[in-house]
């Protein structure tokens, strides 16, 4: 007994004419039970670093394990392709990357809900995907009913600032557009290349600037590497550990909130996620928070905890 896996395609109006010329037509991997029933939950995975839908990967193995234990009930679970040339996606609208928030909220959810007659919607993801799940849920509690944020970007000062000197050195005397084109063709990026692409990508989402040649501003001076506090201030407006206090009423509307983090997370996200948890707790937000032994990577099995939790809450 295993889940049905189907790949469908959706053509997005929200992504038309995106600055990166990334594909407008996207694949969505759909996991569905043998019997499809009305009003089942719709769960959407938001990938971390450029995850693309693949049949029979670790994610599908986890889902099939849960399905055989009857923990997925009648839920429809989808894994869309949200990849960008920056190798990251924060799932918000940006003229420097594309309108991914609109793509999800205005296109994917209505399309899938109509196709499978689903009801409550839940988002889940790790790292950037966890950030996206939180951010979309707190901004659209009328559409999103719950989310699972697995060690998502938070307390940005610990996550991103260590990568800024690396990015400065990686980009020194280089044209950023040429750099992006070169790295987009590589399958085996070095650690420094990944870190540089991460800062470039975050700049595209957090500090976009339509008047700039690149459509975004970096948080450091290109010639010296010195920090730019004015740009950084744009970034931290998106920091869940800081902005959560602005969304208390919206969070209270949600049916399910799941947070977790590894106590050895390489990006110190045990600080960010712990802070987010404490602020939710202080403000009376019902949620589940777990810490586990491990780091930031190779943690797909954490979905064995969050997905059944979301499905149970969103099936009520």
Locate the predicted segments by residue.
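Non-catalytic cap/lid and distal C-terminal segments of serine-dependent acyl enzymes
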Residues: 1-316
């Amino acid at each position: 007994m295993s889940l049905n896996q189907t790949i469908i395609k959706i053509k997005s109006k929200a992504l038309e004419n995106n600055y990166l010329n990334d594909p407008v037509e996207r694949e969505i991997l759909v996991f569905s039970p043998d019997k499809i029933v009305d009003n089942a939950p719709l769960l959407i995975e938001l990938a971390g670093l450029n995850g693309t839908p693949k049949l029979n990967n670790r994610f599908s193995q986890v889902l099939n394990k849960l399905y055989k234990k009857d923990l997925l009930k009648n839920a429809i679970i989808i894994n869309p392709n949200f990849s960008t040339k920056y190798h990251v996606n924060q799932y918000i609208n940006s003229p420097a990357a594309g309108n991914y928030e609109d793509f999800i909220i205005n296109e994917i959810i209505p399309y899938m809900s109509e196709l499978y007659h689903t009801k409550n919607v839940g988002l889940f993801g790790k790292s950037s995907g966890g950030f996206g799940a939180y951010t979309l849920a707190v901004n659209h509690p009328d559409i999103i009913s719950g989310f699972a944020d697995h060690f998502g970007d938070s307390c940005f000062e610990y996550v991103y600032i260590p990568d800024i000197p690396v990015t400065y050195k990686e980009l020194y005397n280089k044209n950023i557009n040429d750099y992006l084109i070169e790295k987009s063709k590589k399958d085996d990026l070095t650690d420094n290349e990944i870190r540089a692409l991460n800062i470039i990508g975050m700049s595209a989402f957090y500090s976009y600037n339509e008047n700039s040649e690149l459509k975004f501003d970096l948080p450091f001076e290109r010639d010296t590497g010195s920090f730019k506090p004015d740009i950084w201030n744009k970034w931290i407006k998106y920091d869940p550990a800081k902005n959560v206090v602005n969304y208390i009423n919206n969070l209270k509307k949600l049916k399910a909130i799941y947070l977790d983090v590894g106590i050895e997370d390489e990006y110190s996200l045990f600080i960010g996620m712990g802070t987010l948890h404490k602020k939710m707790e202080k403000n009376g937000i019902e949620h589940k928070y777990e810490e586990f032994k491990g780091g930031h990577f190779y943690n797909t099995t954490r979905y064995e905890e969050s997905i059944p939790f979301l499905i149970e809450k969103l099936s009520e």
